[in-house]
């Protein structure tokens, strides 16, 4: 049974994983807590605490073995298998998601793409042929897709979420600004670039205020 993690720790571990995987792609064999902290904006002390919490330790003066760290975090997060994804929405955003080369490297495969626009159905986005939304339930069952991504106009989001729930999808990533209503047992993660931008601008404003403050 996988260890139950607090949401905050899970979020930080995914950041460490992403950074370490990128460093491996750049040819690195080891990574320090300071580097992980610098790239994620997390205090290095917190980094060490988090990794100690999952039973992973580094070597003084060397840091953490990158490959071992990736395997440890992937194991804790349950990412050692491949997950098929059903993506609804073949517009600009959906096409960009389907064409991503990063997702497969992280164990996520856009297996099916759906839309209700006749002009989009049948064309290829990424490596996937767009299907009609009416095929969602059947395709999800055949491909064992447990993750759904909503990249539609906001007006269609709730209806799509309902279809995903009916298809037994249990994790939904919502790229719209609609607050979705789903039954217990279904998890919705809202991807909100605006919130991230406001979060970033807050720290930018704080830094500018500190720079403008007179010295004492």
UniProtKB/Swiss-Prot annotation:
Residues 15-54 bind DNA. One of its GO terms (biological process) is response to redox state. SUPFAM superfamilies: NAD(P)-binding Rossmann-fold domains, Winged helix' DNA-binding domain. InterPro entries: CoA-bd, NAD(P)-bd_dom_sf, Rex_DNA-bd_C_dom, Tscrpt_rep_Rex, WH-like_DNA-bd_sf, WH_DNA-bd_sf. NAD(+) binds at residues 89-94. One of its GO terms (molecular function) is DNA binding. It is found in: Cytoplasm. Gene3D superfamilies: NAD(P)-binding Rossmann-like Domain (3.40.50.720), Winged helix-like DNA-binding domain superfamily/Winged helix DNA-binding domain (1.10.10.10). Keywords: Cytoplasm, DNA-binding, NAD, Repressor, Transcription, Transcription regulation. Its main location: cytoplasm. GO terms for cellular component: cytoplasm. It holds the Pfam family CoA_binding. NCBIfam families: PRK05472.2-3 (NF003994), PRK05472.2-4 (NF003995), PRK05472.2-5 (NF003996). HAMAP family: Rex. PANTHER family: REDOX-SENSING TRANSCRIPTIONAL REPRESSOR REX, REDOX-SENSING TRANSCRIPTIONAL REPRESSOR REX 1. Modulates transcription in response to changes in cellular NADH/NAD(+) redox state. Belongs to the transcriptional regulatory Rex family. Homodimer. This is Redox-sensing transcriptional repressor Rex. It comes from Rubrobacter xylanophilus (strain DSM 9941 / JCM 11954 / NBRC 16129 / PRD-1).
